[in-house]
Design a protein with these regions (language model features):
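Intrinsically disordered, low-complexity regulatory regions
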Residues: 1-148
Length: 148
């Protein structure tokens, strides 16, 4: 009996991965161990965008990753001074949305730049939820939230 060409074989069917606490912990640990997005995608058998989306949500608190082609520096090459300002604003706990606006970038561009350059740190709430400590990841003050 021949198989129809349009039907996928059993190993072609992709089973969606749902992020539970154990997978999130592993993702964050591997990221802070230096595994890049491509390798994380391979490790978790996911597309790069799925990895970005989860890391950005966990580490930056950004849920919406809608591109905005109307911003002045949409998909343009990052310059050294721009990177310096990005790091400075991030370290001052300025929310990613405000950083993007100030730099003339869209939110996904800023978030991906922070993730790809390993400039992002783990918020204490996320570290606590995932059972991580300073030996596992770099933990700093909560980004994007005011501290008193």
């Amino acid at each position: 009996m021949s198989r129809r060409r349009d039907q996928p074989a059993a190993d072609d069917i992709r089973i969606p991965t749902f992020w539970d606490t154990a997978l999130r912990r592993e993702l964050v640990e591997l990221y802070f161990d230096g595994m890049d997005i491509e390798m994380l995608g391979w490790h978790f058998d996911m597309k790069a965008f799925e990895i970005y989306r989860e890391l950005i949500a966990l580490l930056l608190g950004v849920k919406e990753l809608d591109e905005d082609p109307s911003v002045p520096r949409f998909r343009k090459r990052w310059e050294y001074l721009e990177d310096s300002e990005l790091i400075r604003l991030y370290r001052r706990s300025v929310p990613v949305e405000q950083i993007a606006k100030q730099l003339g970038r869209d939110v996904p561009g800023v978030a991906m730049r922070l993730i790809n350059s390993w400039w992002v740190t783990c918020p204490p709430k996320v570290a606590k939820t995932l059972g991580l400590n300073e030996d596992d990841v770099e933990i700093t003050t909560e980004h994007g939230e005011e501290t008193s």
